[in-house]
């Protein structure tokens, strides 16, 4: 069994937030190391069902071994797919409604810690960053083939990098001489593009650029938005969605979508009764996001930026 070590963040809070019914049908959109799936399974009866998605075959294979007995009993079903295909994949299995859906977003620890995957600026590795290894677009393609304007846009939008233009300009200059093949090369040229004073504060100088490229390679925000829209429609009455985010762009997207779904639309003044078609179908369970305890952050530093938001279908 291939190792897939990952400390699950906000484990109990996210699963408890789903208000699990023992005979219910649930979806874990981000299987990873199986932490959330395992806790959901422990709360299900023999009639309960869990459908666990991951686009990384390493995670699927690891969990097929880990949950071999539950898999044979049909309690857990593994789906190798991007969670943007949630409706299509569940429809194939004649699942038209579910009681809860969980998302634990971002890159899992094994993906970060496996140097060959090219997610981390701490290792020198081929520029890859694909969550789905069968996908054709890689970080190398983005860095070497995308235009200066495209690079500036993703560095600003997905990395919130204020030195986006100088980094993109440096990339453009270097790649005209020789292809940029590795994370180490990319880190070096990012450092060259950022003023020395700025490099000394605010964490690793390549962090924001690497985040931006990773989001672009995997279309993470597009996939999340599409998936959440479908997930909200899939919920049975009383069903809930728990979403754990790790960076501000994801959290903002979830916050805005949940607010829209739980707010009344603008109506003409003086209407005596709100029409049924205009009534709110969802309610927020978390007015403010749930964040990890100091103790959890002490034991798992990667938890420090996590935020959990929960919504329920009425």
From Swiss-Prot:
Example GO molecular function: rRNA (cytosine-N4-)-methyltransferase activity
HAMAP family given in the database record: 16SrRNA_methyltr_H
A GO CC term attached to the entry: cytoplasm
InterPro entries xrefs: RsmH (IPR002903), SAM-dep_MeTrfase_MraW_recog (IPR023397), SAM-dependent_MTases_sf (IPR029063)
Keywords assigned by UniProt, alphabetized: Cytoplasm, Methyltransferase, rRNA processing, S-adenosyl-L-methionine, Transferase
SUPFAM superfamilies: Putative methyltransferase TM0872, insert domain, S-adenosyl-L-methionine-dependent methyltransferases
Reactions mediated catalytically: cytidine(1402) in 16S rRNA + S-adenosyl-L-methionine = N(4)-methylcytidine(1402) in 16S rRNA + S-adenosyl-L-homocysteine + H(+)
Annotated Gene3D superfamilies: Putative methyltransferase TM0872, insert domain, Vaccinia Virus protein VP39
Identification of the protein by name: Ribosomal RNA small subunit methyltransferase H
Function field: Specifically methylates the N4 position of cytidine in position 1402 (C1402) of 16S rRNA.
Organism listed in the record: Ligilactobacillus salivarius (strain UCC118)
One GO term (biological process): rRNA base methylation
Family: Belongs to the methyltransferase superfamily. RsmH family.
Binding site for S-adenosyl-L-methionine: 34-36, 54, 83, 104, 111
Cystine connections: none
Location relative to the cell: Cytoplasm
């Amino acid at each position: 069994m291939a190792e897939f070590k990952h400390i699950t963040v906000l484990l109990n809070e996210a699963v408890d937030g789903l208000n699990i019914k023992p005979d219910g049908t649930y979806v874990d959109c981000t299987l990873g190391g199986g932490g959330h799936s395992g806790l959901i399974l422990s709360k299900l009866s023999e009639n309960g069902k869990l459908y666990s998605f991951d686009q990384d075959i390493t995670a699927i294979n690891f969990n097929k071994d880990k949950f071999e007995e539950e898999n044979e009993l049909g309690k857990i079903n593994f789906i190798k797919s991007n969670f943007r295909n949630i409706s299509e994949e569940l429809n194939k299995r004649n699942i038209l409604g579910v009681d809860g859906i969980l998302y634990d977003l971002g890159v899992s620890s094994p993906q970060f810690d496996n140097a060959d995957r090219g997610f981390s600026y701490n290792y020198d590795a081929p520029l890859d960053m694909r969550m789905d290894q069968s996908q054709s677009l890689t970080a190398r393609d983005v860095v070497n083939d995308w235009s200066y304007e495209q690079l500036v846009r993703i560095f600003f939008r997905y990395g919130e990098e204020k030195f986006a233009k100088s980094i993109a300009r440096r990339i453009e200059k270097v790649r005209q001489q020789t292809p940029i093949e590795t994370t180490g090369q990319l880190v070096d040229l990012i450092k060259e593009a950022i003023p020395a004073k700025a490099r000394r504060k605010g964490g690793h100088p390549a962090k924001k650029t690497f985040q931006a490229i990773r989001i672009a390679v995997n279309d993470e925000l597009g996939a999340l938005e599409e998936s959440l829209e479908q997930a909200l429609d899939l919920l049975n009455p009383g069903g809930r969605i728990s979403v754990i985010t790790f960076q501000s762009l994801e959290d903002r997207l979830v916050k805005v979508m949940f607010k829209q779904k739980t707010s009344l639309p603008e109506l003409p003044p003086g209407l005596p009764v709100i029409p049924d078609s205009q009534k709110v179908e969802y309610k927020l369970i978390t007015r403010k996001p749930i964040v990890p305890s100091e103790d959890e952050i002490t034991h798992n530093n990667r938890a420090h930026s996590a935020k959990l938001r929960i919504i329920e279908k009425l």
